[in-house]
Amino acid sequence: MLEYRLIFAERVSVRVTENFEVWPEAIELGRLFAERHYELALVGGPVRDMLLHRVSHDLDFCTSARPEEFEPILRRWGHDGFWDMGRKFGTLGAMRRRADGTEVKVEITTYRSDVYDPDSRKPEVQYGDTLEGDLSRRDFTVNAMALRVPDLQFVDPFGGASDLAKGVLRTPVDPRQSFDDDPLRMMRAVRFVAQLGFSIEANTAEAIVDMADRLDIVSAERIRDEITKMLLSDRPRKGLEALVESGIAQRVLPEIPALQLEIDEHHRHKDVFEHTMMVLERAIALETDQEGPVPSPDLTLRLAALLHDIGKPKTRKFEDGGKVSFHHHDVVGAKMTRKRLKALHFDHHLIDDVTELVNLHLRFHGYVDEPWTDSAVRRYVKDSGHLYERLNRLTRADATTQNRRKSLMFEHAMDEMEERVKELKKQEDFNAIRPDVDGNEIMQLLHLQPGPIVGEAYKHMLDYRLDNGPVDHDIAVEELQRWYEETCKK
């Protein structure tokens, strides 16, 4: 990238006026547009990231030209790829490869001045005439800045650079108008709290509280995508706290604010919500690098940490002596997790994995009191399957006791169990464990046709294999016949 001294508008904070790196491809595109007497400006996230000294991998531009006018220019520039899925919104995209093999992707949109239907967040697309008018329809001032190319004039009509320097999220126009036009902007606000560590300006925050119910018109997929981006950020806790405080969570993840009403059974935390936030942070800290078993950021682990205790409100019971219990909250929580993630249209594989982690998150606790037999360890690994590494991290993250002795006992037990698993894996491949007699042999030995009894017999023999390890085939056959005589012939 090339380094330039930008020409700043008067409203730009002195704290952010310095040298910035600009993609040479942006300058080149600007010259191509200028030759045809069209305006072109880098806008939104790439400009914000430039001021934060972050690298943007995709470049967004807006222009005075209509799509049919700038399409030939873009096709000529982006000789390695072109797409027009956003044509009806005035957007075309292109890609080119550099000599080093890296790709530069750009999307260019005609200036917009949209009209919104109050019953939908989808605007009636109308083209605008000025860059400033286009910037006024953007979500927040920190995203309503532009850099004209090729002359590198910085355009900031709403004080976005100043807000960026202060770490504040504010809308370019009245926040109620902005959120009424596009309610998803409220979700984007809390997502930026997580991604950028910003705070929401008071008037903007008040508008979110008042208008959270407008999110009801937003599709589940859009809500899911914002939640995902927030959870995969560096500071998801800040975003989740803003989600709850603003009332948005009540509309999109009601199980989370419900945790604020529940007192932790050990009275270690202000409420279960606080405990959940701590578990999430601890789980993130246990993620690995890209070469490890749980590469960061891991959406499955983070969702499981967020949802692992949502069954507590429905299972709360007041015991003698003022104690509170939440028996079977793991099972209840797993059912609630599946229902919520399905409502948000998450991928079914992810739903299965997160649900199973919530279901199993208490499984290890019995080991602390009394170490398991080898068969119990095998069963733990077999039952957790491909989620074994994630389950161990969720289990460790969930151990938030402030009692130093208990904490050390738990960590020692977890370390011991993991070492035992390593030793047992040297003896056999847990993922390949099967009964010593398969389904076909079961039917042959017991003279059965395919049916439920064959399935029950297979499950029994798998349990027997887990409990006893590998045994001689004759012993396995004897066990099968014994089980059949005692269970099915009574």
Which positions does each model-derived feature cover?
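Catalytic cores of the polymerase beta-like nucleotidyltransferase superfamily
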Residues: 1-490
